Amino acid sequence: MADADEYSTAPTQQEITPLQTTATIINAISGECITTNVDFFVSLDKFKQFIARKWKIPPDQLLILLPYGNKLKPSMFKELLINRSFTLNDFYVYDRRLFSLVSKPTSTNLLTSKDSNPMNSPNSNDLTETLEYLIKNSHISQYQGSDTIMIKPMPSPLEDADVDLSRLNYHSVTSLLTTNLGWLSALEIDVHYFKSLIPDIIAHIKRIFDGLTVCSQYLKLYCFDVESLYNSNVQFLNQLVDNGMTSKWEKCFNDTLSKLTALEGDSLQKFINIESLLENEKSVKILNHSINGKLNKIKREIDENASFRDIITVNIDRLRQIFTPNESKFELEDQMAESFEVLVSEMRTRSRNVLDKEEEEFNSQEFLKSMNVMLEKDKKESVKTLFTISQALYSQIGELIDLKKSLQKHAVAILGNIAFTQMEILGIKRLLLNECNKDLELYKKYEVEFAQVEDLPLIYGLYLIEKYRRLSWFRQILSFISNFNQDLELFKQNELRTRNKWVKNFGSIATVFCEDLLSSSDFKRLNEYHSHTSPPNEDEEDENENSIANYRQDLVKVSQAIDNYMTQIKETDVSEPIIDLLSKTLFETKRFHIIYSNFKNNNNNSSNGNSISPEGSIALKSDDVVKGYKTRIKKLESLLHEFQYSDIGHWPQGVLNTHLKPFRGSATSINKKKFLGASVLLEPANISEVNIDSVSQANNHQIQELESNVDDLLHQLQLLKEENNRKSMQISEIGKKISDLEVEKTAYRETLTNLNQELARLTNEEQSHRTEIFTLNASFKKQLNDIISQDNEKIEKLTGDYYDVSKSRERLQMDLDESNKKHEQEVNLLKADIERLGKQIVTSEKSDAETNSSSMEKGEKFETIPLAEDTGRENQISAYTQTLQDRIFDIISTNIFILENIGLLLTFDNNNNIQIRRVKGLKKGTAQSNILDESTQMLDAHDNSLIKSPVFQKLKDEYELIKSVANGSEKDTQQSIFLGNITQLYDNKLYEVAVIRRFKDIETLAKKLTKENKIKRTLLERFQREKVTLRNFQIGDLALFLPTRENVNSVGSMSSSTSSLSSSFSSVDLSTPPPLDAMSIQSSPSVIHSNVINQASISGRDKNKLMRPWAAFTAFEESTRYFLKDEKGLTKGKEWFVGRIVTLEHFVADSPSNNPFRLPKGSVWFQVTAVVVSYQGV
């Protein structure tokens, strides 16, 4: 059965074995995640150290939250390690430094677009710079250096190649296809890389949102604790106010305490300090007002803090709406990637098939024509399609990375809002704990003092009852001591008789091992233990009886005082529960009696005079009854021990079992029960038979009870033994399991040690890589600073030009406004002069008529003189009017020309009303003509043919008509029409409004162009960092490194190799993978030369295993070569790689030592070293 049990429990143990606890660690700002096993870490500190090494966050700056906002504590982590029942295995990691940008959350910084600034404050520039610094120095983004990792796809060399039939031959076709295959492989790698980045960045963005949500939940939990603390304070204050005695204690003091008398006859008011209570009442009123004011203020602050949390939640939701990428948008990219794979496969297959052809097949014109068709098709269709797809994916990745960076900035800003909200709620918590709690404790202290006034009647009544109980207890103790002395004396006498009887029966034999059988040392010790060294005499008994009598008198006195007190308290306003409690306590106290065992009940019925009355034994309390049962149990245990001692069979070996047994032959049939009553056999003859029978009957009854108890105990003992055996078996099984677990624990420890060592090694490697990256970043930063300084100079120059243009525009505007004012003033003056002249003409005509009618003779006499004067005056007015008209027309022409020069045309609408509208290309004709004055760029006063305005043409026609018409009514009519049209133009403010609006548009356009220029400058910097250089290499340039191609015509011939190295397009071979180990170019060219000579001497069978040098791809430079100096085995296992040039060493092939690659004499070549940025494995 044991084996069956083992087999049945084995599957159960296998089922309950917990799985390993895995955890996902998420960087809440960068979106990165790590999956690890929590069992690798023995404590939370080790767990934090692992995260700190991974993300370069100091352990003291780490904040780890669980998915529902709980902070990870050592106790939680320990529970996860021990129980493995923790279901929340996602850990969100925050850098506390990112919470340092503390800002108040307001509704003004709600986001509306992806490009909006997360900081909308007067110091937004400083805050933005701080934000950039925090993000830069916290290692929060996996793609922080993505600008250097992302390589922009470059066009195929096939696009610029000449694929005419006349230029096609074996070498040109194979070189072109080989180079294009290299470009195709590089493009395919880039596309696969871009495609894999899209879901990763989308997942990072989603995790950033989850991190913000978890942090907001953490804030809500923190604030919930503070709100609970506030609610508890308010509830406590309400309880104090509702149950307080501030306004009730005086009534109790005057109405109740004055009617109750104490033992001395005074009222209970003497126990109350009335002055202190009055002072406390004033303090309570002031304190209540202060606490209410503080709590109301805290309530407003809590509500404001809740509004902050709502704003943060709204901001997070708005961010989720704005920055969540639309995954349906990337379905097109998936289709493009599929078509890309098909095109790449087809194009590579066609190129491989051509490269597999022999050189003789290229002599056929039909084959060359087919090559021409294939290359033309690839050049016009396939290459462009592939390049377009790669460009689309590249731009998509760039947008996603920019989107993530912008989201990170907004996320850090929201963390600052969360930090502000938490600091505010922390201040509220401190206020509640420090000030409000102290005030409430003081309030409670005062209320307790007030409540003592109302509780005083109850407490004083309980005091009187307790005093009565103590007197009763002491009286009963005195009675008990008196009875106990009598019982003790009786015990001693009975024991002496028993000992004498035993000595008489067994003393002669017992002297063998006991000489002094009549020793009374135990009686001496008993006397020393007891306070009385001798039996009490009659005088002491009389004193005890007197003391008892005195205590009885005191009891009667206190009992009367209690009855009077109960009568008084019933007449007051004390509540009924208090009166009932006092009555019940008094009733129980009067029935209080001490329970003790009276020996005389079993030995001497005649000495039962001082026993407890039957009425007293009935009124025992429940606690006293329990104590009585315990006493009976102890008595039964002592009787059981006496019974076992009396039974000879229970004695140990050697006692009454030797040859000295005196009753061996004569007492074989002695019953145990009878032997238990040996005292009966040993009783002196003077003991009455009645007492013996009573004791024997009592003992027999007790023996029967004890025998049944012994049987029960033996049965229980047997059950306990079985249970003990079963427990022992379980303990042994558990011990085996523990030993197995210890072995497993040791194995786990060894595994963990090995893993920690491996982790340390990987950490060191990562640190070395980071050091290299830091070096590269330093060089990149230097180049970037140079570019930025150049761009800043250009920006300053453009800004200065823009400032000059703005000043010129303002100056022209001021001049224009002044000229307009002058023109208006002149027009008004001319109008006034015209009216004045008209009135003078009318007046003169009237005077002339009167003069002619009154004196014809006098008129005839002086007819020549007035006519001459009128004619001169009219000619003068006419000339002045003509000058004024010319001046007005010149002003209007100039204004209209200014409008057209800034692109505005003065024309008519459909209702024949004058309007000014924007017309593109209007000022081109003006700019191309030579009529403008070179100094002012204004219209010549004598030529207005460039003005295209129909309104101006109409005014011009009217002006010409006025000039052509002679003086008279018709001319006056034309002048009125001319002035009316001019008035219509200037009265409606069309000219001023149009010019001001146009300059505002120009200013807006200038700002827009400045912003676009900044964006283009950023793109230019980005493209500058990402471009792959194809000629004139410098330190820091990106270059494509490929293995050189050897096309050996015959064994041992290096001619084709030399020609291969000398060719620009055939200097690399992408059709076949490189050998296992790339050629290691040493620092000295002579060593390179010796390697080449040694390679030439190798047999043809081993020539395919030669190590070929690598060179930088130079498609547009035929005179210079760039060979890789490979000291660290960079090319091992690579088909090609893109590297950044670190060093350049110049050589001229003028001697064999400087020409290890057999280049044409006088050729210039460089020896370069590089670091790998991207590569394609074999």
UniProtKB/Swiss-Prot annotation:
Keywords: Acetylation, Autophagy, Coiled coil, Membrane, Protein transport, Transport, Vacuole. It is found in: Preautophagosomal structure membrane; Vacuole membrane. Acetylated by the NuA4 histone acetyltransferase (HAT) complex. The keyword Membrane applies. The keyword Membrane applies. GO terms for molecular function: molecular adaptor activity; protein kinase binding. Signal peptide: none annotated. It is a peripheral membrane protein. GO terms for cellular component: Atg1/ULK1 kinase complex; phagophore assembly site membrane; vacuolar membrane. GO terms for biological process: autophagosome assembly; autophagy of mitochondrion; piecemeal microautophagy of the nucleus; protein transport; reticulophagy; ribophagy. Residues 538-572, 696-846 form a coiled coil. Involved in cytoplasm to vacuole transport (Cvt), pexophagy, mitophagy and nucleophagy. Recruits mitochondria for their selective degradation via autophagy (mitophagy) during starvation, through its interaction with ATG32. Works as scaffold proteins that recruit ATG proteins to the pre-autophagosome (PAS), the site of vesicle/autophagosome formation. Required for ATG9 anterograde transport from the mitochondria to the PAS. Also recruits the ATG19-prAPE1 complex to the PAS. Required for the Cvt vesicles completion. Plays a significant role in life span extension. Homodimer and potential homooligomers. Interacts with ATG1 kinase and the ATG19 and ATG34 cargo protein transporters. Interacts with ATG9, ATG17, ATG20, ATG30, ATG32, ATG36 and YPT1. Belongs to the ATG11 family. This is Autophagy-related protein 11. It comes from Saccharomyces cerevisiae (strain YJM789).
